[in-house]
């Protein structure tokens, strides 16, 4: 039991080391718009949480034989809609929170709207990506002969952490160009 879990944790640990690489890639942007760093935990945890949730639901459905590996396409279509809906809900809440704090406490500066838009759009994209990754990885793990229950959710969290940073800062570069960046 320990060996099986330790192997995955070590693999995932090395995967998480890539988060520093991803953030380093956007070091200049973070330097110019430090406010972006404030939302990194919110962004990556939302993607990881949505992915883990989707992964758990698919693993359960596979275990109960409600779905089979060949049903991956049907599951993916359903999860795209779910990811967009959930991402839109969290994106709207994220934007509204930034707008409220900007109005009440005058934080985030004169470009608060663009920061809020960046966070909102990033949440939509990352929750969609997390949901898709989380729903598809159990199928991949099962197909490769691994136990999806021990590997999928942690792998999803690691994958979404690293790629979520790339998505977030990529959106920031596009949205904030000419204002904060």
Residue ranges and their predicted role:
Residues 1-40:
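Cytosolic regulatory modules rich in charged/polar residues
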Residues 25-40, 106-118, 148-149, 181:
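Membrane-water interface of transmembrane alpha-helices in multipass transporters/channels
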Residues 72-93, 97, 102, 107-108:
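Short alpha-helical transmembrane segments in multi-pass integral membrane proteins
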Residues 141-160:
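Interfacial loop-to-transmembrane junctions
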Residues 169-181:
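Juxtamembrane boundary at the C-terminal end of a transmembrane helix
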